């Protein structure tokens, strides 16, 4: 992982660990520690008109999540949202950036070894693959990247009223 990040971005092993792999490991540890409390039904306030009832909030997965990640923190910003999506009970399609090819290949290898394709799929490629993915229907889209591409993601998501998380940069 560190070698791929060095080849793609010139990151040292220390920076790779502190800014990418260490944070992913921390997120995995956090989710494993708290997943049962996150998945539990929570009792909430019931309006007076329904005084004979009890109200609950029950977490429920979206379904298939599309995760599109950027080139600058390719390991962290691909796997961090994936950890959360899987912990929430979703399946995922992961699209790492074409601009960090060595890291994208490591991500693809790791995910293919750890998950069956029906749970987590990896799509590599450039803009053509991004467009093909966005023309498909997903239940949730998590995108990190530029404002210009974020607008395109939002337009495609609007066709299906797909909820999105956009983490946009300059």
List the model feature ranges, each with a label.
Residues 20, 99-103, 167:
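Short acidic-hydrophobic sequence patches enriched in Asp/Glu that either
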Residues 1-56:
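N-terminal Rossmann-like NAD(P)+-binding subdomain of aldehyde/semialdehyde dehydrogenases
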